[in-house]
């Protein structure tokens, strides 16, 4: 079986969407809601480490994808007092090469992935005043208003 890998590592993935607003609802209750900022879908593998997470967080928080007064994407989340909505999404590891039913064997095991997801949330809260989240493992309904749209996929293989 082949994976999208560098060496023998499966990569941590962030899908970053610049939004005007976004929210997460679980069983009819809003678990997180933000205004201008990033909705981040987070894919965690069993091979991810704290060091990888730290590099991904640094890159995420430093991304300059908001427009300055000249209309150039030159401002970071910090610069615009942006907010974060962080959602764990194991389906980022879907392997669709065989048959019609995706395999998710590359996704992190729930216990480890939940700890890593919580670590990412905690680290982001140290830097960004408003950090909201979904509920790990829950069936979530995500609403968002894309700004742009502006969507970036960060793969730890490209930055680590």
Where are the predicted features?
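Short, Lys/Arg-enriched N-terminal segments with co-localized hydrophobic residues
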Residues: 2-11
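Compact, glycine-rich, soluble single-domain proteins
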Residues: 30-81, 94-122, 127
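Short glycine-enriched loops at secondary-structure junctions
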Residues: 20, 84, 89-92
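Positively charged, low-complexity, intrinsically disordered RNA-binding extensions
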Residues: 104-160
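Long, amphipathic alpha-helical "stalk/connector" segments that mediate intersubunit docking
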Residues: 12-40
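Glycine/charge-rich, flexible interdomain linkers and switch-proximal surface loops
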Residues: 69-84, 132-144
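Short beta-strand segments
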Residues: 17, 43, 88, 143, ...
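Residue-level signal for inorganic ion chemistry
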Residues: 56, 87, 150
């Amino acid at each position: 079986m082949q994976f999208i890998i560098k060496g023998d590592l499966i990569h941590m993935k962030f899908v970053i969407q610049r939004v005007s607003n976004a929210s997460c609802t679980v069983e009819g209750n809003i678990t997180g809601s933000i205004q201008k900022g990033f909705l981040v879908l987070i894919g965690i593998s069993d091979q991810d480490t704290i060091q990888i997470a730290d590099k991904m967080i640094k890159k995420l928080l430093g991304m300059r994808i908001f427009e300055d007064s000249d209309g150039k994407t030159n401002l970071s989340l910090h610069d615009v007092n942006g907010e974060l909505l962080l959602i764990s999404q194991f389906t980022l590891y879907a392997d669709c090469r065989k048959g019609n039913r995706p395999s998710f064997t590359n996704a992190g095991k729930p216990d480890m992935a939940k700890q890593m997801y919580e670590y990412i949330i905690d680290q982001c809260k140290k830097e960004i005043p408003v950090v909201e989240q979904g509920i790990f493992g829950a069936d979530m309904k995500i609403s968002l208003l894309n700004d742009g749209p502006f969507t970036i996929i960060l793969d730890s293989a490209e930055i680590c």
